[in-house]
Design a protein with these regions (language model features):
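Alpha-helical recognition segments enriched in aromatics with Gly/Pro capping
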Residues: 1-32, 47, 118-331
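N-terminal, positively charged nucleic-acid-binding surface of large information/translation enzymes
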Residues: 8-13, 17-103
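Short coil/loop linkers at secondary-structure junctions
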Residues: 59, 83, 105, 223, ...
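Short, well-structured beta-strand/strand-turn elements
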Residues: 59-61, 131-137, 370-371
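Short catalytic-loop micro-motif centered on adjacent basic/acidic residues
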Residues: 63, 107-111, 227-229, 380
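N-terminal, positively charged, Ser/Thr/Ala/Gly-biased leader segments
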Residues: 97-133
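Structural preference for alpha-helix termini/caps and helix-kink/transition segments
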Residues: 270-271, 277-399
Length: 399
């Protein structure tokens, strides 16, 4: 299939392996608050990608992590006067309930940072040995000057723009322990009241980026087929993963395809936990069917940002009602209904950079044609094709 690779900046051919499963790593949630529709959109993209690859005879090994050691989690736990691990468990449990409600495929591996820290130490030691990192007062930093290509994925136009963006996303440019303001943390001393783990550099905790390198390489190997997440990870998270993973393993590329979903907006602002302008999945599924939410989220080009409009999302209930009607419509004894053209176009759309929004137009056409001919035409084969196509999009109604 053709798939857009963020690092290359264009579509390229993704060869689906025949002798092994395709490996997919997706950056998961930081469990300090409940899953929102923006998260659901990101995970829907990869859910449909997996379903499509499997429909074409491929296999996928899927790893999605939980970032349960991170500043936002500790800050929220401190604010709410709750133990950080209790908060994390509560929100992970809710997240899994939301995933079940949305009919998301369960990952093959679901590692939590808090259970993987011992595996990060050897990687950091390797980066120090390879001259990619340095120690300063119990902290370890990656030396970005050792990798001139650092940040090229983001196409931000130069050092100052990289630094400005990194600063907005957790970087501390004024840390006196750093050689360069853009250098990022591999291991850090913990703040008072935060959890710590032992290390050769003293007690502390890992930096954000090294966590994903350790988990992805442990469960999927040193080189991945696809690495994904939301577009907000295009910098600094994913470029940091690239340089530290390749700096440790010596193998390039770390990932064949970088796939990023667009961000979800609400009332003119990016939907985010920090802003508090959220539509929680747990609330949305009480107001409408999960299938209708899935239809609505799949109706946008996956790489583009979109504005979530509650009324439009609710209107997708009509599409699901029509789907259910078509799947159970009475079969007539007249001519056979031929929907092969729409079925072919449906799969062709997904084959061309996972164009879910285009695939849905052909799915809707199949539904409309079946409902128009129910009771008069022989629609059994068309219904079977519809069920298969709807299954690729992941509709529970098709199961």
């Amino acid at each position: 299939m053709q798939l857009f690779d963020t690092l290359r900046g264009h579509k390229a051919t993704l060869e689906i392996p025949k002798d092994r499963p395709l490996t997919l790593y997706v950056c998961g949630v930081t469990p300090y608050d409940t899953t929102h529709i923006g998260h659901a959109h990101t995970f829907l993209i990869f859910d449909i990608l997996i379903r499509y690859i499997r429909s074409q005879g491929g296999q996928v090994t899927y790893c999605q992590n939980v970032t349960d050691v991170d500043d936002p989690l500790f800050e929220r736990a401190n604010r709410d006067n709750i133990a950080w691990d209790v908060l994390a468990k509560r929100e992970v449990d809710q997240y899994l309930k939301d995933c079940t409600a949305m009919n998301f495929l369960a990952p093959d591996f679901f590692p939590k940072v808090s259970e993987e820290i011992s595996g990060m130490i050897p990687i950091i030691e390797g980066l120090l040995k390879n001259g990619k990192a340095y120690v300063a007062n119990g902290n370890v930093f990656f030396d970005v000057s050792s990798e001139p290509s650092y940040g090229e994925m983001a196409r931000l136009g130069g050092y100052e723009e990289l630094l400005k963006t990194a600063n907005k996303r957790g970087n501390n440019p004024n840390d006196p322990n750093k050689t360069d303001p853009l250098d990022f943390v591999l291991w850090r001393t913990s703040n008072p009241g935060e959890p710590t783990w032992p290390s050769p550099w003293g007690p502390g905790r890992p930096g954000w980026h090294i966590e994903c390198t350790a988990m992805s390489t442990r469960y999927l190997g040193d080189q991945l087929d696809i690495h994904g997440g939301g577009r907000d990870l295009v910098f600094p998270h994913h470029p940091s993963e690239i340089v530290q993973t390749e700096g440790y393993t010596g193998k390039r590329p770390f990932t064949r395809f970088w796939v990023h979903g667009g961000l979800t907006w609400l009332d003119g602002a990016k939907m985010s936990k920090s802003l508090g302008n959220l539509v929680f999945v747990r609330d949305a599924v009480l107001q409408q069917s999960p299938d209708s939410i899935r239809w609505y989220l799949a109706s946008f080009p996956y790489r583009e940002d979109f504005n979530y409009i509650r009324a439009d999302a609710k209107a997708a209930e009509g599409e699901i009602a029509a789907l259910v009607t078509a799947l159970s419509a009475p079969v007539g004894s007249g001519p056979v209904l031929d929907v092969n053209d729409d079925v072919t176009a449906f799969y062709a759309a997904l084959d061309d950079d996972l164009a879910m929004h285009i695939a849905l137009t052909h799915l809707k056409s199949i539904i409309t044609r079946i409902n128009a001919k129910s009771g008069t035409h022989s629609i059994r084969a068309a219904q079977q094709q519809l069920r298969a196509c709807a299954g690729v999009i992941g509709f529970k109604a098709a199961e």
